[in-house]
Every structure is written in structure tokens, then in C-alpha cells.
């Protein structure tokens, strides 16, 4: 029995399912989850001492690679001054200034401790600001585990929200309308049906929780126009895409300006940080300047602020954005070429520093329905073949992969050598 197997057995006695976030349990791919002991650069090392080239990167935050010296140094300098104050600090101002500089649509920003907090708070703010209750989200898009956003999509162009499982009251979930990603007509239908009731529309600008699905054509600009037409707040959820698709986020890459933006992952440099921000007139509706309440004991935590500031400062250096995108392109197109070589039905999609692997006959995957038709069983086999060769991909056919600046050309080539062998066995 491996050390990971021993630890998983032990964990299940004191932690529900043995993990503190469901995807870590490997239920999507089968087998025992790998327990990590340490990480450095592009590599993670498990409890048995085996090293893996890591394309999960803690689900996105580790864009500089693990244990980056600039972040570690910033944290070590901040720690002696105290771990938490529950009071304002200069570091939260400095990070906020950098965020508003990098993302011009954000005029004011509020720090929180997670992406879920960010999206939950942004939706509450939009509801308070507009005086409306209903929200629009998209099938297959994930915005954290708050009640408003944990709803089952159902079929058809438009579905009144149904609870995705126990714990979400139907009377609450009914205010969530679910539309089809990359389908403006489904959104138009929602607005036409409830023209004066929709507080906001929230969207992942690149859907990263049904693998990696970029927006088609002018999908995002079409959403912007519909929100303007019907007086709804347009929220772009950049928890995953922020600073990764481009320094200014996916909104800069696709040239679209939201009313509110949610951030997470990279903004904390590996520490628990989230944020939401946007137009001054909307953000001033949040307490203490406005009537919509939001608070957090650890919001703006000084250690987390130091890590986030170091991460964004390093990431902002000339050439890093281009390097990240180029490395991602090399990897994704390399996967596709090898699949073609071995006659495996497959497509790879990528943008900026994120990518998705789909086992499908389709040349392009554009929404959740198409994702569900992909061969998840084949992905699971591919995942384990890669894992055996020391490559750690996302343990789910529905999650995006992440490149980091620490991945070298040699790391990518080693990954593709492993992929060549894996595709040959499918």
C-alpha cells in the first residue's frame, strides 16, 4: 500500500470523503488521490517521494510556479509583523491600487477570502443595487458554492433554477435562470420573459469548469448589450481567468467591459484571497458607504495581501504574459498532433495560460451539452497513463488545465513524450 493510499484511508475517518474539496477525491477518474508533500517550480512531489510535472497548479493560483522566491520572500517579511489584525493595513491599499491599474473596469475593489465569497457578494450587491431578485448564469459554469449558483440547469434554452442537491431551497433557487453558454438567443429569451426582474448576469468569460471553452465570436459583447438593454448588472467572473488569460483578464483579451468583476486564485499568489470590484457607483452601494452588507474577519489579511502583491508584481514583468500563452499553445497543439498521429478522436482548446483536453470527434466544443457527449472514460484512462509517467493533469474530464511560467521547454517536451505513449495505448 502506497503512502497516499494509507493517508487516504486515514483521512476518511476524520474528513468527509477524505478530502476538503470534492474534486480532490479522484471520483471523476477513479483510483486513490495523490497526497502532496511538497512542490517546487513546475513540480509537485507526493508522499511517496514521486515527482510529477504539475498542470493543476492548485487549480489555477500558481501561475508563477510553486514556491516562487518572490512570493516566499514577501510572506516571510510580512509574518513577523503579525498574522491578522482585523483592521486596515497599507498592504491592502497597495494591492487594490495594482488591481485597479491592471483591470481598468475596476474602479473600486473589495477584498475577501475566496472566489465563492467574491461571486456571492457581487450577486448580493447587484440585487441590492437594482432592487431585483433574479439572476442569469450558464449551464456548466461554476461560480462557487453559494446557494444562488448551485442550481441544476435542466434542458431547453431556458430553465427556472432547480436545486442541484439537498441544502438549497427550491424557493431560493427559483430566482436563478440558466441559459446555454455561447448561445445569445437563450439569453434573449430569458430577458424577454423577465424584462424587469433580472438583477444581473454572471458568466465565466472562458468557461473553465466544463473543461476549457472560449466564448464564440461576439458572445461576451452580446451579453454586455443585453444587460445594457434590460438594466441588468453585467458580472464577469474572472476568478479563474483573471491575470491568466491576459494581465487585464479575459475582459481585456476579448475587449469587453463588465459592471462588476470577481477575482480569486492568482490574486492571492497561493494564499486564500478573493475580490470583487467594478463601477464606483455600484461599489459604493456596499457597506459601509451603502446599505448592502458584506464583511469578513480575514478579508485583506496582511500575509495574503503580501503574497498577492508579490505575485501580480512578478507576473506583470515584460514578456511573461506572452511566454505563458506561447507555452500553453505549444502544449495544447502538441497534444492534438499526437492524438492525430495515433488516430484518437481528440481536440484541445486553449487561451492564455489555460487549456482543455476533449476526447471527441468534434473539432470544437462550445457548450455543456457538447462536453457531456465527450468520452470521459477515455479521458480517465489517459489521465492515469499520464500520472503513471509523472504528469499530473486535472483529475476530471470537466476541469481546465493550467500552465505556469515555471514550466520549461524541457518540461513540455517531457509531457508530450509521455502523451505519445499514452495515446498509443488508447
Curated annotation (Swiss-Prot):
Keyword Cytoplasm attributed: yes
Cofactor(s) recorded in Swiss-Prot or TrEMBL: pyridoxal 5'-phosphate
Cellular location(s): Cytoplasm
Repeat found in the keyword field: no
Record keywords, A-Z: Cytoplasm, Isomerase, Porphyrin biosynthesis, Pyridoxal phosphate
Major location category of this protein: cytoplasm
The organism's place on the tree of life at top rank: Bacteria
GO (cellular component) term, any one: cytoplasm
Involved pathway(s): Porphyrin-containing compound metabolism; protoporphyrin-IX biosynthesis; 5-aminolevulinate from L-glutamyl-tRNA(Glu): step 2/2
Substrates-to-products reaction catalysed: (S)-4-amino-5-oxopentanoate = 5-aminolevulinate
Coiled coil, from the record: none
E.C. no: 5.4.3.8
Modified residues (N6-(pyridoxal phosphate)lysine): 265
Record GO biological process: protoporphyrinogen IX biosynthetic process
GO function term, MF aspect, one: glutamate-1-semialdehyde 2,1-aminomutase activity
Pfam families, per the entry: Aminotran_3
Subunit structure: Homodimer.
HAMAP family xrefs: HemL_aminotrans_3
Family: Belongs to the class-III pyridoxal-phosphate-dependent aminotransferase family. HemL subfamily.
Protein name, as recorded: Glutamate-1-semialdehyde 2,1-aminomutase
Species, as recorded: Actinobacillus pleuropneumoniae serotype 7 (strain AP76)
Gene field: hemL
Amino acid at each position: 500500500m502506497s503512502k497516499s493510499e494509507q493517508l487516504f484511508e486515514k483521512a476518511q475517518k476524520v474528513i468527509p470523503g477524505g478530502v476538503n474539496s470534492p474534486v480532490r477525491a479522484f471520483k471523476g477518474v477513479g483510483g486513490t488521490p495523490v497526497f502532496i508533500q511538497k512542490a517546487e517550480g513546475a513540480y509537485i512531489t507526493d508522499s511517496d517521494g514521486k515527482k510529477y510535472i504539475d498542470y493543476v497548479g492548485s487549480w489555477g493560483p500558481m501561475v508563477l510556479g510553486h514556491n516562487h522566491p518572490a512570493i516566499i520572500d514577501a510572506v516571510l517579511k510580512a509574518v513577523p509583523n503579525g498574522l491578522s489584525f482585523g483592521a486596515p493595513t497599507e498592504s491592502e491599499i497597495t494591492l487594490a491600487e495594482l488591481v485597479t491599474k491592471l483591470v481598468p473596469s475596476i474602479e473600486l475593489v473589495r477584498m475577501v477570502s475566496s472566489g465563492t465569497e467574491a461571486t456571492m457578494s457581487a450577486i448580493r450587491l447587484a440585487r441590492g443595487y437594482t432592487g431585483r431578485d433574479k439572476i442569469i448564469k450558464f449551464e456548466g459554469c461554476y461560480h462557487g458554492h453559494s446557494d444562488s449558483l448551485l442550481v441544476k440547469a435542466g434542458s431547453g434554452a431556458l430553465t427556472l433554477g432547480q436545486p442541484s442537491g439537498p441544502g438549497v431551497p427550491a424557493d431560493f433557487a427559483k430566482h436563478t435562470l440558466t441559459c446555454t453558454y455561447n448561445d445569445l438567443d437563450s439569453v434573449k429569451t430569458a430577458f424577454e420573459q423577465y424584462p424587469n426582474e433580472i438583477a444581473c448576469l454572471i458568466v465565466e468569460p472562458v468557461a473553465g469548469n466544463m473543461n476549457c471553452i472560449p466564448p464564440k465570436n461576439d458572445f461576451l459583447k452580446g451579453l454586455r448589450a443585453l444587460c445594457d438593454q434590460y438594466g441588468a448588472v453585467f458580472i464577469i467572473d474572472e476568478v479563474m481567468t483573471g491575470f491568466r488569460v491576459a494581465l487585464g483578464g479575459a475582459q481585456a483579451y476579448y475587449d469587453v467591459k463588465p459592471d462588476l468583476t470577481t477575482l480569486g486564485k492568482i490574486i492571492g499568489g497561493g494564499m486564500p484571497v478573493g475580490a470583487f470590484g467594478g463601477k464606483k457607483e455600484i461599489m459604493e452601494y456596499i457597506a459601509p458607504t451603502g446599505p448592502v452588507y458584506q464583511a469578513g474577519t480575514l478579508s485583506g489579511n496582511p500575509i495574503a495581501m503580501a503574497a498577492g502583491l508579490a505575485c501580480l508584481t512578478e507576473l506583470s514583468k515584460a514578456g511573461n504574459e506572452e511566454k505563458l500563452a506561447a507555452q500553453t499553445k505549444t502544449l495544447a497543439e502538441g497534444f492534438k498532433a499526437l492524438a492525430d498521429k495515433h488516430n484518437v478522436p481528440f481536440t484541445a482548446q486553449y487561451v492564455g495560460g489555460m487549456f482543455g483536453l476533449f476526447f471527441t470527434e468534434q473539432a470544437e466544443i462550445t457548450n455543456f451539452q457538447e462536453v457531456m457527449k465527450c468520452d470521459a472514460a477515455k479521458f480517465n484512462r489517459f489521465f492515469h497513463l499520464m500520472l503513471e509517467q509523472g504528469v499530473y493533469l486535472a483529475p476530471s474530464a470537466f476541469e481546465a488545465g493550467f500552465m505556469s511560467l515555471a514550466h520549461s521547454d524541457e518540461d513540455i517536451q517531457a509531457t508530450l513524450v509521455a502523451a505519445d505513449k499514452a495515446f498509443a495505448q488508447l
